């Protein structure tokens, strides 16, 4: 571990983990947000180039769970688009074609619906890819952790803070669930058991 500009940095191999991953509390409160992270913001979910082939290959399996407007977006744009920061992200439904679903929080959102959304009977937003039993993008599974590819090689993991996830940070604090604990399974899947064990050890050290 070392002290970086923004606090303690945990280094595990070629992965730099910010302190907030192991010190902040988080537990998704779906009953409150109802999947708002999939329909808010101005960009789709980050994608790794290695995920594109799977998105295309599995499309026949999960497309039936998508909305008609979502399928239209994929037909028009393909399985990804490039955002204003030149990052590869999931395609978005055109704003004029997006419908407002759910309660007042969703209705007042800056609407940028992911093409891979599926909506339940009560207007709640789910992932069509996951609904079909396929693997959704890693950035979705790892949220609120965001991955940055470093110029010199390696990765950096940071916690992304977003107003719509305030209930999740509050729920995590109530239930004493840390970010890395909430994301144990996706972190292990993405980086391996040895990585997660090292991260847990670092967390215990920081918490004294």
Would you name each region that the model predicts?
Residues 1-208:
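Short loop/turn segments that flank or connect secondary-structure elements
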